[in-house]
């Protein structure tokens, strides 16, 4: 945008900033390739009436969102009162936006792989059972991909779709190897499982710290490419979401979310 001579402003705290018209001017000195968000985030839903007023004569609004926040961007894009071109950029560690690969997922998988390495060292060195709880309240994609990334170091992967007797499987792994590393989705209730095991289990819960790390090279390149492609597409099209490999109009996002 700046290369085209356009001024760039950022609304702070997600859609809360748009609702309250909290914004700041962006220049090159603001740009940082590290983790986190320069503008910060919130879980506030967009207030369409206030957003229409605060958008004013902005040409384009880039909404860097996960699945829930993208619904606010969608509602903005589909409101007839909004003249601004609404452009969604898929970004979430959970990769749970149907039909769209998002920025951040590969970084989260890579960070989880490091936690699995640590869990493996702890379990195998102390002949113990270690649970690693993977975040994701509505999607277990992180759990399954982390399992694939460190398959040789994991004895059990448990998601809501896992069938069978968890306890028996874990006990078998422990008896066979002398240790067990269990990667389990946050969506699973497992307190009963821990108390029913023959040995006391240890639990590692990295939580959302996995998203507060430097982006991996893949995500850094992906982010740069996605925003450039989104900008180019926005010159002739409006109201769409840019994923890693495709573009989805907001009107289609309405039908599947």
Regions found by a protein language model. Give the residues of each.
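N-terminal phosphate-binding or glycine-rich loops at protein starts, especially the Walker A/P-loop
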Residues: 1-16
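Accessory alpha-helical/coil subdomains and C-terminal extensions
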Residues: 8, 63-66, 71-75, 80-83, ...
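Short, glycine-/Ser/Thr-/acidic-enriched flexible segments
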Residues: 16, 44, 136-137, 188-189, ...
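Glycine-rich oxoanion-binding loops at beta->alpha junctions
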Residues: 17-71, 93, 101-110, 114
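Acidic/polar active-site rim loop that often engages polyanionic ligands
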Residues: 89-102, 124-126
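C-terminal non-catalytic interaction/assembly regions of soluble proteins
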Residues: 190-257
């Amino acid at each position: 945008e700046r290369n085209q001579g356009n001024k760039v402003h950022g609304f702070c705290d997600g859609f809360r900033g748009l609702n309250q018209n909290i914004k700041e001017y962006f220049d090159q000195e603001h740009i940082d390739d590290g983790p986190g968000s320069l503008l910060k985030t919130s879980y506030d839903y967009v207030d369409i009436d206030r957003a229409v007023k605060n958008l004013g004569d902005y040409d384009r609004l880039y909404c860097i969102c996960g699945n829930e926040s993208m619904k606010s961007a969608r509602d903005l894009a589909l409101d007839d009162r909004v003249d601004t071109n609404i452009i969604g950029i898929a970004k979430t560690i959970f990769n749970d936006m149907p039909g769209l690969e998002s920025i951040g997922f590969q970084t989260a998988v890579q960070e989880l792989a490091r936690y699995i390495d640590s869990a493996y060292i702890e379990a195998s060195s102390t002949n113990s059972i270690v649970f690693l709880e993977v975040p994701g309240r509505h999607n277990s994609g992180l759990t399954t991909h982390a399992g694939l990334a460190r398959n040789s170091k994991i004895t059990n992967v448990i998601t809501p779709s896992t069938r069978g007797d968890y306890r028996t499987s874990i006990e078998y792994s422990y008896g066979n190897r002398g240790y067990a590393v269990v990667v389990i989705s946050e969506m699973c209730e497992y307190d009963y499982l821990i108390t029913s095991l023959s040995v006391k289990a240890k639990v590692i819960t990295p939580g959302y710290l996995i998203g507060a790390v430097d982006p991996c090279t893949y995500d850094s390149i992906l982010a740069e490419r996605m925003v450039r492609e989104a900008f180019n597409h926005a010159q002739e099209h409006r109201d769409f979401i840019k994923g890693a490999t495709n573009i989805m109009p907001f009107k289609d996002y309405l039908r599947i979310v």
